[in-house]
UniProtKB/Swiss-Prot annotation:
GO CC annotations, alphabetized: extracellular region
UniProt keyword annotation of Signal present: yes
Record localization: Secreted
Keyword Methyltransferase: no
Signal peptide per UniProt: 1-26
Function, in words: Salivary protein that moderately inhibits the alternative pathway for complement system activation in the host.
Record keywords, A-Z: Complement system impairing toxin, Disulfide bond, Secreted, Signal, Toxin
Protein name per the record: gSG7 salivary protein
GO function terms (MF aspect): toxin activity
Disulphide bond pairs: 84-139, 107-117
Amino acid sequence: MAARMTIMLPLAVALICLLQTEPGMAAHSHIRKVLQLFRSIELDDSKKSFYLTAAKYGIQTQLREPLVRFAGGFAPSTRLSEACVKNAIARIYEIEGEFYAKFSYACENHDPYSVECLEEAQDDYPTKLGELFKKTKKCLRE
C-alpha cells in the first residue's frame, strides 16, 4: 500500500501541475502576440517629447494593457485574430493624427504646440482609444 502511494502521489501532483500550466502557456502566447504587434507601432520621433509621452501613455493604458488582460483570459484552443489587432493599430495612427492636429495647428485657444493645447486635446484622445478597445475586443477571437 505504501509503495502504491509513493508512486501515485508524484503522478497526481505532476498531472495537477500539467493541467494548471496549460492555460497559462496559451495565455502567455496570446499576450506575447498582442505585445509583439503593438511593438510595431512607431510614432514620429520629431514631435515634441511631452506630446509623444502623452500619446504613448494613452495607447498603453487605454488599449494595449486592456487588450493584454483580455487576451490573457483566452482558452488554449482560442485563436487570436492578428488581422483584428493590425486593424486596431492602423486606427491608432488615425486617432493619434487627430490628437496631434488638435495639439498643433488646430489648437484654437492657446499657442500651438503648448502644454495647454496638449491638455485640451487630451480630452478626446483616451475616449477614442477606449472606443477602439471595445471594437477590437469584439473581433479579437477568430
